[in-house]
């Protein structure tokens, strides 16, 4: 019975916890941290009557602000990154090789991965610059519904001039 428990503990220590922490680190890179300031900047939901009206002047800025994370690293995120660095540094320790052999590309990749993770802990994240000057596309409103225009918009098919005027 104790052998089963020992094997289970070894399995958890070797495989489960390192992969769980690596998953936490990988998942946290893609998810923005929400704060009260970010929630107040999001536009309010429009009603059904104003759903057809879209303001294109600030659309790109709103889309970029919703996508951009706050670049904050909390304690548990730092803890997970440090643990992953520790596990990777032990797993990627160089083997005893003769001195004459050149380092392999895989070793260079491992070193680059460790340098990137350690730089995330030591360097301060800077948000990307917001582009203030936008070129807006001209959208001509259609006055009447036509099947060829609908097909060309929905499926990208265009067989002639869009307007005959």
Curated annotation (Swiss-Prot):
Top-level taxon: Bacteria
Signal peptide: 1-37
Annotated GO MF terms: translation regulator activity
Main localization, broad class: cytoplasm
A cellular-component GO term for this protein: cytosol
Name of the protein in question: Secretion monitor
Pfam families: SecM (PF06558)
Origin species: Salmonella typhimurium (strain LT2 / SGSC1412 / ATCC 700720)
Function of the molecule: Regulates secA expression by translational coupling of the secM secA operon. Translational pausing at a specific Pro residue 5 residues before the end of the protein may allow disruption of a mRNA repressor helix that normally suppresses secA translation initiation.
Annotated disulfide bonds: none
Key words, A-Z: Cytoplasm, Periplasm, Signal
Family: Belongs to the SecM family.
Locations listed in the record: Cytoplasm, Cytosol; Periplasm
């Amino acid at each position: 019975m104790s052998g089963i428990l020992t094997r289970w503990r070894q399995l958890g220590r070797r495989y489960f916890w390192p992969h769980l922490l690596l998953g936490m680190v990988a998942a946290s890179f893609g998810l923005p941290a929400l704060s009260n300031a970010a929630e107040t900047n999001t536009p309010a939901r429009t009603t059904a009557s104003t759903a057809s009206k879209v303001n294109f002047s600030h659309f790109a800025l709103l889309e970029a602000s919703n996508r951009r994370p706050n670049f904050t690293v909390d304690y548990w995120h730092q803890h997970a990154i440090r643990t992953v660095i520790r596990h990777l540094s032990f797993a990627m320790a160089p083997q005893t090789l003769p001195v004459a052999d050149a380092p392999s590309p895989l070793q260079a990749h491992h070193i680059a991965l460790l340098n990137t993770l350690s730089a995330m802990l030591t360097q301060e994240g800077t948000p990307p610059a917001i582009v203030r000057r936008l070129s807006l596309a001209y959208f001509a409103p259609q006055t009447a519904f036509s099947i060829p225009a609908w097909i060309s918009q929905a499926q990208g098919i265009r067989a002639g001039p869009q307007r005959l005027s």
